[in-house]
Amino acid sequence: MLIINEEHLLKRIHTLGAVGLDADGRRTRLAASDEDKAGRDLVSRWMSEAGLTVVTDYIGNLFGIWVPEGCADAAPLMLGSHIDTVINAGQFDGCYGVLAALEVVETLKVSGFVPARPIAIGAFANEEGVRYAPDM
């Protein structure tokens, strides 16, 4: 049985949660803001450190992709959520889905598991819809 590193996951959630935190303890990473970019840069770095291919599309969706040998033509399994926030957001909103997916992929890789298809982790842009419509 595989078990993710809960402490590692929570440390990343707290680290990302500090991005966009103001002096009053309010967390804000509006899409396309400097805080959103800082959060995306951080998650992108973690994806890269995990050995994933990191891609950002034209509207800012961030993807970390694991393509094991021999399955490049298979449709990927997509996991993820978003890391942008509304004003005064909760710490776990959205980022839990992205960071938990990253932790799962890292656990699978370390265990030696080789999936039959690529696995992509998405951090979708403007999920909260505060910058432009439609959202996500």
Task: Enumerate the language-model features and the residues they cover.
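Short glycine-enriched loops at secondary-structure junctions
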Residues: 9, 68-69, 83, 125-128
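Active-site nucleophile and cofactor-binding loops and adjacent substrate-binding regions
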Residues: 56-57, 90-96
